Amino acid sequence: MVRAPLPIRDGLGPTRIRMPDASQFRTILDYLVDRFPQDSTRLREKMDLGEIVDASGTPLVAESPIVPRADIYLYRDPPIEPVVPFATPVLHRDENLLVVDKPHFLATMPRGKYIARSALVVLRRELDLPELSPVHRLDRLTAGVLMFTVRREVRRAYQELFADRAVTKVYDAVARYEPSLSLPVTLRSRMIKERGVLRAEEVPGEPNAETFLELSEHDGRHGMYTLHPRTGRTHQLRLHMNSIGIPILGDNFYPEFYDVADDDYSTPLQLLARSIEFRDPFSGEQRRFESNRRLRLPI
């Protein structure tokens, strides 16, 4: 990965923009203003302040000519974002790892309308950890254990644990109780999620998603389910629960999408990343981190 020439600022890294192969624009500024007309005034201000740089970190000026396929870097101005009114407690911190108990509704990474108030940016800023990076991700609507690396040089070793399926993950979910289901069960299917499409879907083909599902308790109407994902596809647990007729309570994506206001925190998705366990790639120690949050059956 190419290292950006600008440092982390206020928890946010710079944005990279690649110039087109060929262009009718004479200067970089002309191209930027045409591509982002709503930001034309701020782009000119950033250029005047030397806040737009090339790949070597050299500030660009208004007359800097376009170089085909060259990369430039600048800091985005974060949009006005909804404040997620829930804390993100630290479960563990050492020289390599930061583990937190993410609340529902908080995005893991800067994305879409959640930039400065994503978990990554907030924690970088509040804990003064500019090299902080997530080892894995949780959906914005999912709560529970979320792990970050503190230092750049250890990032790959921990990320490879997840890529190699060397991490044991346990989730809890609340859904309708269905006595006709034969549980426990291992669910396998092929899932795809196209870029720009909100929902994932199951399609014919070789399975790429696997979840072991068991019922922990029920009250006759709702059940508490324990899920053991053996793969990590986007929305895997939500889609697998829906596929057997018991969508997770509070899921506004499956079986059908319905919109929820950004500031409506009344019905959180009843899905919790309860624990993760793995052998540390540096110390060899078996490590386990567990959420202090708990789901409950509706009264």
Model regions and ranges:
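RNA pseudouridine synthases
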Residues: 1-299
